[in-house]
Amino acid sequence: MRTFEKKQILKNVGSSWSALAINVIVGVFLSPFIVHRLGDAAFGVWVLIFSITGYYGLFDLGIRSSIIRYVSKYTATDDREKLNGFINTALFSYTGIGVVSMVLTTLLSSSVERFFKIPPEMHAQARLLLLMVGASVSLGFPLGVFGGMLEGLQRFYILNWTSIGATLVRAALIVYFLDRGYGLLTVALITVGLPILSSILRGIIVFRLCPVPLGLKYVDRASFRHMANYGGTTFLVMAAARLRFRTDELVLGTMMSTVAVTWFNFGARIVDYAQEFVSSLAQVFVPMSSQSEAVGNLDRVRKIYIAGNRVCAFLIFPITAILIVFGKHIIRIWVGGRYVPHSYPVLVVMIIPFALMLAQAASTRILFGLGKHQTMAAVTVIEGVGNLILSIALVRPFGIVGDALGTAIPLSFTCLVFLPRHMKKQIGVPVGTFLREAYTLPILLTLPLVAALLLTNRFFYPRNLIQLVIETLVVGSVYMIEMFWAYRTHRAFHVAEVAGLTEPLPAEQPPQAVVSVEYQGEQ
């Protein structure tokens, strides 16, 4: 890999991990602070309303990914006319979508308590909260063009650093106002207002980097066609991702209570942090595989497939072990011991299938990079529908654990049965070869860590966050020493010549559009 590629990857991934670290740290301290100030019911309403408006992301219709694609393309070819047309067409389209979503928000806010089990005393707050969050999301559509432009220009680090700034300011303001007796709506105003300000800042920055004239005269049909053709599969993936990972709170809010939403959220939130950590790395495999395929180097694609998934496994396997063994301590110290009986089972049920998915995070990115993601999108839709049906069926007899099982069962099937076989068909690496080359070393290195975790958990009981962090770092040093050995001996990233181990590929298909999608909580 060329030096500038390595620097770009390190810069973008490093800033992504920095943003994630800040989000985790803020979340660790802010979530219990908010829930203890507002109460379980109010916090559950908060999570529920954000879950509802999260579905507005489907109105994106794949436009964001097309912005990334065509900004990258037109800046590379220095085609200013097409770039101007595309950006203005995207802004025009997003403005229309924002208006529609605001109308929908107004309609929903008048009857939100009819659909969800919200305490009567919180009906008025829930309506106002939905209006505030919905308005922010609606405005976020046209403002999101600026973030898409930055991604197309490969300036992920600008996105990440502006996000870090907004996160820190948000945390400080929430603590300040809650300490002075303000409530749910004040927290909401802070939470939805700062992303708008950061988007405006990104717009100022991106127009200095890449000046684009604005006006209706630049809107054109050709750009509409490009967006429609490119965004179709992206929309399917986005809809499927919502079904997979964003229906749990709605099912619980409809069939149980907002308190159950709070219990579920604490266990699932920890899993989300693990997912974001791995996904921040995995996103670099989209352009890497796309570039390799473009020059006909499929052997390099196969090596990315094995080495990329191995790196993902190096990250998620030890994280999974730590969360399962220390999970009760994490929840107890984070939000309080009374949440452990409810939230820890959710954590365990969710982290295992998510580990299976994240250990193959490179696989899905390679499919997008090669433009061979259509079958995966269809399977994901089927999985999402199965997720929703199972969650509804299991939540009555098993409560929030049943809801978690509704997500875990179909996700495990996709990861264990479908994905490795589908990758074999697409790039020709036999399943046995893939499993052996990608996962033998990560599993062997994780086993001593598991033993150390179990031994430590038996004899030591962390009573506060500092003790928990120290205990985790001491035990984690076992794994770090092993990883240092694997790196120094070149075992960590070495991949044997795989060309001779592969099965013949089917006849090459014409290249499809490459879609850059950040999975939701695969975000």
Please tell me what each predicted stretch does.
Residues 109-133, 323-355, 427, 461-462, ...:
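Interfacial segments at transmembrane-helix termini and the short loops linking adjacent helices
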Residues 427-431, 453-523:
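Membrane-proximal transmembrane or re-entrant/amphipathic helices at the cytosolic face
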